[in-house]
């Protein structure tokens, strides 16, 4: 039994973010649709070839997406919301972009679909919308076209398809409520048609992704798998693919399915390989997800070999990445600024392909010498002084319960804050960042490259901050921000100023659509060598009599949006970051900054996938935030911001943060999220986002007023703030000015009654 290897998917954006640049050029009207499509074809061909050259046997096809793969599946099934449909009923790439962005070079603008996190990763998808009586048909043949491309290039192809049950699970009902699972029989004929088309092309195996099978699903959803896969069997071999957790709790459901193979995540899952081998049908192939698709760390291949060797020769076996390599940067070899020791600890997507080749070869031959050689830097790292800082470990061990308690309760603090700030009803503010113009990005880049000295750089940043204050005062906002011109990314900026982090030059990963992030990597104990934000916050406050918010990214978000080290717990990392940022809060306060925002957009998305694991995570996540904030005095107002969240299942923890004001993303969900706060009787102040910053569309005064009135039916008006959904860094100034002017006008109208 020869062992093969494969990946579940590969990064799409290109080493130099070619896809992002092509998308944004097309959206701006600077290039044609055909030019965009050509970039996509070139990237796919390059990425298949790179994987093949790195030693991958079966290449994933269908993992490429123009926005996200769930949205691609929606178009495949003909699931296009009426507001985004072309007048002639056709579907094209602009249809896809209108769903994702609210607008495209052709067609009428309309509200973008809701966006949320893909399981517990930092990747996003557009939430499918379902209505009662909906019809589905094969509408978008991107998968088939890409399979044809790969076959024409001579590749050994394994198509990738999001499974029908997971697809329905990920969506939301719009309008009249009904059970979306009832649509299963309506979408299965489209899946049958796609599988038939793949069979015609001579495809042997199809990777059908059902990551919902790692969740604690309701019984009705588990029961849906058998009839669904009964309907899909027979045309090609199906590799039922799961990831992000183990499958043991749902193994009885899985083993009853008429599929020919199962992929399991043996990195994040707790599954025992011997137990899996025993319980899986003997004729099934097992795809062992041994190489972590979500991290940047070199694998200990001797350990991976030991994990799987006992079943070699006993069943058909493939070795694979745990999940798609989408979540990892592309290529470590282009990183020229990492020192040799640190670089030796890492593996990006292409290096992970090489790891799979080494592992396959060792399992087939029994010769493990190459595995030991590859794994040597992992052993050396365990004793590196770059990793351990005794002072940090000592401070962490000394934390007491008092360190996470504000001096007084919210009611006492609110009185002190009202006396200090004297804000009007319906106070207006923004979430933090303002448009990152070409001028700002060029300024930072020139400084980073050494083409601009520190004095000229600081003068330039100061001018952009001054302009941001002038703009806000002109608009009539009540609580201002400095605009974050000096920050490239809300996590990367802090990581650059904290010990224990390193950065890459080209370690980009896709977040959503054309948005890419370059996460910091936590390599050791975290500490703050010097103040980070104080100087610019103090300067901004000197320009105005209105309060200017200090802006920090919270400890859980820095953790969740970085690549964490794996030799200590996530709790340990979060609390180390919290202690570092606690010192920053104290320094901001001492500099006269009276409102400090600690953003925690990632608190909910960091939840474990299984509800039974939530309590432990929420306990330390809340404690980390409170350690960060609790040093503040009563009349210092602590804000926090959260986005893409559903709160109803963690309201106790949201309240336990004890932030004076929470701002949340609500406009895409039409204020639905406020139901949670109303039912919980949330005691502190809330700023429900009144317009969607992910879309360039400008909301009308009337629309914002209507949303605020809707909010006031759920939350007392005296505890409501008025703000956008999120930061404005990705927007342009024209729509930002127009949207904020309308937002301020709506607040003023409500003050007048």
Curated annotation (Swiss-Prot):
L-homocysteine binds at residues 431-433, 484, 599. InterPro entries: Cbl-indep_Met_Synth_N, Cobalamin-indep_Met_synthase, Met_Synth_C/arc, UROD/MetE-like_sf. Its cofactor is Zn(2+). Its EC number is 2.1.1.14. 5-methyltetrahydropteroyltri-L-glutamate binds at residues 17-20, 117, 515-516, 561, 605. The active site is at 694 (proton donor). It comes from the Bacteria. Zn(2+) binds at residues 641, 643, 665, 726. The keyword Oxidoreductase does not apply. Pathway: Amino-acid biosynthesis; L-methionine biosynthesis via de novo pathway; L-methionine from L-homocysteine (MetE route): step 1/1. GO terms for biological process: methionine biosynthetic process; methylation. L-methionine binds at residues 431-433, 484, 599. Transmembrane segments: none annotated. It catalyses: 5-methyltetrahydropteroyltri-L-glutamate + L-homocysteine = tetrahydropteroyltri-L-glutamate + L-methionine. Keywords: Amino-acid biosynthesis, Metal-binding, Methionine biosynthesis, Methyltransferase, Repeat, Transferase, Zinc. GO terms for molecular function: 5-methyltetrahydropteroyltriglutamate-homocysteine S-methyltransferase activity; zinc ion binding. Binds 1 zinc ion per subunit. Pfam families: Meth_synt_1 (PF08267), Meth_synt_2 (PF01717). Belongs to the vitamin-B12 independent methionine synthase family. Catalyzes the transfer of a methyl group from 5-methyltetrahydrofolate to homocysteine resulting in methionine formation. This is 5-methyltetrahydropteroyltriglutamate--homocysteine methyltransferase. It comes from Shigella sonnei (strain Ss046). The lineage of its organism: Bacteria, Pseudomonadati, Pseudomonadota, Gammaproteobacteria, Enterobacterales. The gene is metE.
């Amino acid at each position: 039994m020869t062992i093969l290897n494969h990946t579940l998917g590969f990064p799409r954006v290109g080493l130099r973010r070619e896809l992002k640049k092509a998308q944004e050029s097309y959206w701006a009207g600077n290039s044609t649709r055909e030019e965009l499509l050509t970039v996509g074809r070139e990237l796919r061909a390059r990425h298949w070839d790179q994987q093949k050259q790195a030693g991958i046997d079966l290449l994933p096809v269908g993992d490429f997406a123009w926005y996200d793969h769930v949205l691609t599946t929606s178009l495949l099934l003909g699931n296009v919301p009426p507001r985004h449909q072309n007048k002639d009923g056709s579907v094209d790439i602009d249809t896809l972009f209108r769903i994702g962005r609210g607008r495209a070079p052709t067609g009428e603008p309309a509200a973008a679909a809701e966006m949320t996190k893909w399981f517990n990763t930092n990747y996003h998808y557009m939430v499918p919308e379902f209505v009662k009586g909906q019809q589905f048909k094969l509408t978008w043949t991107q998968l088939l076209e890409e399979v044809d491309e790969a076959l024409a290039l001579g590749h050994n192809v394994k198509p990738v398809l999001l499974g029908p049950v997971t697809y329905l699970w990920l969506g939301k009902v719009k309008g009249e409520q009904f059970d979306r699972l009832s649509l299963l029989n309506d979408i299965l004929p489209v899946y049958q048609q796609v599988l038939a088309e793949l069979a015609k092309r001579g495809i042997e195996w199809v990777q059908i992704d059902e990551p919902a099978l790692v969740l604690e699903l309701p019984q009705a959803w588990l029961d849906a798998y058998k009839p669904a896969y009964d309907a899909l069997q027979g045309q090609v071999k199906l590799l039922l693919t799961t990831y992000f957790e183990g499958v043991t709790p749902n193994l009885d459901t899985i083993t009853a399915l008429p599929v020919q193979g199962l992929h399991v995540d043996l990195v994040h899952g707790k599954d025992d390989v011997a137990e899996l081998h025993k319980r899986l049908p003997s004729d099934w192939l097992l795809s062992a997800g041994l190489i972590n698709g979500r991290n940047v760390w070199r694998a200990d291949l001797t350990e991976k070999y030991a994990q799987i060797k006992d079943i070699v020769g006993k069943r058909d076996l493939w070795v694979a990445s745990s999940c798609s390599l989408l979540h990892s940067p592309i290529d470590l070899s282009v990183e020229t600024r990492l020192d040799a020791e640190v670089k030796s600890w890492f593996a990006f997507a292409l290096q992970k392909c090489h790891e799979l080749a080494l592992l396959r070869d060792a399992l087939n031959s029994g010769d493990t010498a190459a595995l030991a050689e590859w794994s040597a830097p992992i052993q050396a790292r365990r004793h590196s002084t770059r990793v351990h800082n005794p002072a940090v470990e000592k401070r962490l061990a000394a934390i007491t319960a008092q360190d996470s308690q504000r001096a007084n309760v919210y009611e006492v603090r609110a009185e002190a804050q009202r006396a200090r700030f004297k804000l009007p009803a319906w106070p207006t503010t923004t979430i933090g960042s303002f448009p990152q113009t070409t001028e700002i990005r060029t300024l930072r880049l020139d400084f980073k490259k050494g083409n601009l000295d520190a004095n000229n750089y600081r003068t330039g940043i100061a001018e952009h901050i001054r302009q941001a204050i002038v703009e806000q005062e002109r608009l009539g906002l009540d609580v201002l921000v400095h605009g974050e011109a000096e920050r490239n990314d809300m996590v990367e900026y802090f990581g650059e100023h904290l010990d224990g982090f390193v950065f890459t030059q080209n370690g980009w990963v896709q977040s959503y659509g054309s948005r890419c992030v370059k996460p910091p990597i936590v390599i050791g104990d975290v500490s703050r060598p010097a103040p980070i934000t104080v100087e610019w916050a103090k300067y901004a406050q000197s320009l105005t009599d209105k309060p200017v918010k200090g802006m920090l990214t919270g400890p859980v978000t820095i953790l969740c949006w970085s690549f964490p080290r794996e030799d200590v717990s996530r709790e340990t990392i979060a609390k180390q970051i919290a202690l570092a940022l606690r010192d920053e809060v104290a320094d901001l306060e001492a500099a006269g900054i009276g409102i400090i925002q600690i953003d925690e957009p990632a608190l909910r998305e960091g939840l474990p996938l299984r509800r039974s694991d939530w309590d432990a995570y929420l306990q330390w996540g809340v404690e980390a935030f409170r350690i960060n904030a609790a040093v503040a005095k009563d009349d210092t107002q602590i804000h926090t911001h959260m986005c893409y969240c559903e709160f109803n299942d963690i309201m106790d923890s949201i309240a336990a943060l004890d932030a004076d004001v929470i701002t949340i993303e609500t406009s895409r969900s039409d204020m639905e999220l406020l139901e949670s706060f109303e039912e919980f009787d949330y005691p502190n102040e809330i700023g429900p986002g009144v317009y969607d910053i992910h879309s360039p569309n400008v909301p009308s005064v009337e629309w914002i007023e209507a949303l605020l009135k809707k909010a006031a039916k759920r939350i007392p008006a005296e505890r409501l703030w008025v703000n956008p959904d999120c930061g404005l860094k990705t927007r342009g100034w024209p729509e930002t000015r127009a949207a904020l002017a309308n937002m301020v006008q709506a607040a003023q109208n409500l003050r007048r009654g």
